[in-house]
A protein has these predicted regions:
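ATP-dependent carboxylate-amine ligase
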Residues: 1-135
Length: 135
């Protein structure tokens, strides 16, 4: 199963992950979240995401350095994101190609892929991604 969700605030991210986990409790939950909005990329606000991905079996966060630059914001360190989400299992990407390649390399047997963003994960084409993952 693949789900695309507009969740981007901490409460919505947590609620979406929990709802998917409740409905697909026997499946591996791969939760991908894009830090995309001005507030989500703010180093003071990012701590609000604490434990939001804790029910995901494989939690992933993506952010774009180009988005940070266009919003005239300071770079975020991977370790700061891991610490803010309070999840040492968190996988962080800032390169959409590497993120996509990682997803394609995964085994999706008995899995749910959850893509949460108000953006598009660095211009990833969801239809192409779905075709690649289902082959």
């Amino acid at each position: 199963f693949i789900f695309k969700d507009f969740a981007h605030s901490p409460s919505k991210v947590k609620a979406t992950v929990n709802a998917i986990k409740d409905q697909f409790d026997e499946y591996k939950i791969i939760a991908c979240f894009e830090l995309h909005t001005f507030s989500s990329l703010n180093s003071d606000f990012i701590n609000e995401y604490k434990d939001t991905l804790s029910n995901a079996d494989i939690p992933i966060v993506y952010f774009s350095k180009k988005t940070l630059e266009s919003k005239k914001m300071h770079n975020i360190e991977f370790n700061d994101i891991i610490k803010a989400f309070n999840n040492n299992d968190l996988i962080v990407f800032d390169d959409s190609s590497k993120f996509k390649d990682y997803l394609i390399s995964m085994n999706f047997n008995k899995s749910v892929l959850l893509m949460m963003s108000s953006g598009n994960f660095g211009n990833i084409d969801y239809n192409d991604l779905q075709k690649l993952l289902l082959n």
